[in-house]
Regions:
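A Lys-centered signature of the CheY-like receiver
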Residues: 98
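Two-component/phosphorelay signaling modules centered on CheY-like receiver
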Residues: 10-29
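Receiver (REC) domain switch/active-site region of two-component response regulators
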Residues: 101
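Conserved phosphotransfer microenvironments
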Residues: 51-69
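Acidic, metal-coordinating helix/loop segments flanking the phosphotransfer/catalytic sites
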Residues: 30-48
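Conserved acidic carboxylate
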Residues: 7
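CheY-like receiver
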Residues: 116-137
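Hydrophobic/aromatic residues positioned on beta-strands within the core alpha/beta folds
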Residues: 78-79
């Protein structure tokens, strides 16, 4: 699975990149702002994205999420305060709250990979809060 990471805290982005690669997936790019994320969406066409809500250019992650949804790319918010996510999760599959454990992220990534691959039979891990209408179109 090709994964895009949208996160303005470089250390967290690098840790997540490492976790994604150790799980056998390819990171198509790291974006720290909404403009970088838009470039990545157009340049690499990821299969999935992790998106922080607050980026270098402000609370623009929700807008990035909506652009991903419009492009048909499933995503999950990664945020320190998931209560700031709009009702319906702005089209996201769900959210992972920071701080997260590497084991929690690994379990979420395994579940997400199955969902993106078309297998919706599994149960979500505790680390992943699903949107009520979460499904991949």
């Amino acid at each position: 699975m090709k994964v895009m990471i949208v996160e303005d805290e470089m250390l967290l982005a690098m840790e997540l990149e490492s976790e994604v690669e150790m799980a056998g997936h390819q990171v198509t790019g790291l974006a720290m702002s909404s403009s970088q994320a838009r470039e990545q969406i157009n340049a690499s066409t990821p299969d999935f994205a992790f998106v922080d809500i607050h980026l270098m250019d402000g609370p623009t992650g929700i807008d990035v999420g909506r652009e991903l949804k419009a492009a048909g790319i499933p995503y999950v918010f990664v945020s320190g305060n998931i209560k700031k996510i709009p009702e319906g999760f702005a089209g996201a599959l769900g959210a992972i709250e920071k701080p997260y454990t590497m084991n929690g992220m690994k379990n979420a990534l395994t579940y997400i990979s199955a969902i993106v691959g078309g297998d919706e039979s599994g149960s979500p891990p505790a680390s992943l809060v699903l949107a009520e209408d979460a499904h991949v179109a």
